[in-house]
Amino acid sequence: MFQDNPLLAQLKQQLHSQTPRAEGVVKGTEKGFGFLEVDAQKSYFIPPPQMKKVMHGDRIVAVIHSEKDRESAEPETLVEPFLTRFVGKVQKKDDRLAIVPDHPLLKDAIPCRAARGVEHDFKQGDWAVAEMRRHPLKGDRGFYAELTQFITFSDDHFVPWWVTLARHNLEKEAPDGVATEMLDEGLTRRDLTALDFVTIDSASTEDMDDALYVESTADGKLLLTVAIADPTAWIAEGSKLDKAAKVRAFTNYLPGFNIPMLPRELSDDLCSLRANEVRPVLACQMTLAADGTIEDNIEFFAATIESKAKLAYDDVSDWLEGRGSWQPGSDAIAQQITLLKDVCQRRSEWRQTHALVFKDRPDYRFVLGEKGEVLDIVAEPRRIANRIVEESMIAANICAARVLRDKLGFGVYNVHTGFDPANTEQLAALLKTHDVHVDPTEVLTLEGFCKLRRELDAQPTGFLDSRIRRFQSFAEISTEPGPHFGLGLEAYATWTSPIRKYGDMINHRLLKAIIKGETIARPQDDATVQMAERRRLNRMAERDVADWLYARFLNDKAGTDTRFAAEILDISRGGMRVRLVDNGAVAFIPAPFLHAVRDELVCSQENGTVQIKGEVVYKVTDVIDVTIAEVRMETRSIIARPAV
């Protein structure tokens, strides 16, 4: 009698439209209940029975109920699920499979089955890739997933690498394919095989892509020739190898091993500038004035060289610092090293004065055993030999940026615009409270940005620098020339690592067109989009593997009195993140470990400080002593506490 009643339908419609609703993201907790976070200020409680319908991270619309001054959310519709494709560990009980996602806030096993075509017989503890197939808010009875790929067994020592690469959907090995012969590019190559070119790299490096040679002139100038490996002499644009390199975009450097962008035969042999082997190169010659200025007579050309020595950073640095027993193999090599030191000093002084120089941070190197176990983590400071190579490469990239801009008007540029214009008023206000005065419009210019950076670098601590980092914009890859504020340069285009960066291969092809006097099309934007995405994924993969290895390395220190010096990275309501100075591991110190009485403790992200009873006790960039309280292997998180 009521089923077709239009009044009843209208009433239902009215009730539905009058019921308050909110859209937000579900935040799970360890305790079974959750919250619907609508924005930074507003969140609603989700009771445990309702949490069974959703997953941490789901974006949903929920009905808001009010009872006795307490509001709660009842999930109604799914806007965007948190899990689509994910990795996890398989559970097997009575031939029934389930998978626990590898995520700190997802603890529940999701029933699953192997997808069609997946041959592997899954066992307890196996790692797998899965895809969600059912969700309670889509009208399904429960969550359900399909296993689409077997990753590895639970006892595989290399789980951190294989699981991380699968999580980010990245390649596990070098690309297939061989390059049999060099292309006929119609280039005339200068024979520079008689010159004393040298390479300087880590002792273990096989993919050497840059060699250097310097001469001094009668009037006190330096002629620097930078010779770069020439993979585009072997790889034709649009070929199978080229397409594979375009997809990978970069060589993926993970702790312990790398996954190259090009087949190893090319990256580690045919293109690698090995000592005493004749190799084709793309070269740039520049003249450096006494003050380090790069003069206007920049020249790019194709050549063949024969590196006369494979030098290692530490050997060269030791020799220049008068330490250790290593000696250059000949007087000619010794002279090259001495001249290169001069190049480095001139360019470094020029950049200090006219551009910006990054503060030196050590690189952390994992020393691994046969079974992927972490034997040691070594902090490798950036020494004089590292700086020689860095200054030479930056100079060469400045040359390419100028030539591409002036001759073509495009290229693959690294662009960084400093601060987001929307943030400069806030920035100026923050700096003013610390007696640093900037004009919000001036700081948007390259000159204004450099002026501020120099002022911040002169501060006694890095505290203020860390406070303004959130106002900065990100570096981008663009086909349009533009300034790089971070380096303090008008334009910057890399071409010195074509074995490991696809963008550098593109710039090689553009520079070759200029050398030959040919016209060439502007690179497609899809290439730069892919590069930016791959750079992001590779960085996340490197961080994930490192987190896993740090947890393994520090596991036996948990609960001991071993002290570590740690720099405070940032402060949030829940506590502080710190980086251990000796090995680079990042740990979290929960707020209760800082002070037992919560009401007397204020952790302020805004100010970058921790106050106890109104007094600042800790601030970002402080270095404090900590001990390791706990290592949670399943989430690869390290919990520390201030050492007493």
Swiss-Prot record:
Gene3D superfamilies: 2.40.50.640, Nucleic acid-binding proteins
GO terms under biological process: mRNA catabolic process
Keywords: Cytoplasm, Exonuclease, Hydrolase, Nuclease, RNA-binding
Main location: cytoplasm
UniProt subcellular location: Cytoplasm
Entry GO CC: cytosol
Entry EC no(s): 3.1.13.1
Record flagged with keyword ATP-binding: no
SUPFAM superfamilies, alphabetized: Nucleic acid-binding proteins
Annotated RNB domain residues: 189-516
Described purpose of this protein according to its UniProt entry: Involved in mRNA degradation. Hydrolyzes single-stranded polyribonucleotides processively in the 3' to 5' direction.
EC class name: hydrolase
S1 motif domain mapped to chain residues: 561-643
Reaction(s) catalysed (UniProt annotation): Exonucleolytic cleavage in the 3'- to 5'-direction to yield nucleoside 5'-phosphates
Family per similarity comment: Belongs to the RNR ribonuclease family. RNase II subfamily.
Protein name, UniProt field: Exoribonuclease 2
Molecular function GO terms recorded: exoribonuclease II activity; RNA binding
Cross-referenced NCBIfam families: 3_prime_RNase (TIGR00358), PRK05054.1 (NF003455), RNase_B (TIGR02062)
InterPro entries in the cross-refs: CSD, NA-bd_OB-fold, RNase_B_OB_dom, RNase_II, RNase_II/R, RNase_II/R_CS, RNase_II/RNase_R, RNR_Ribonuclease
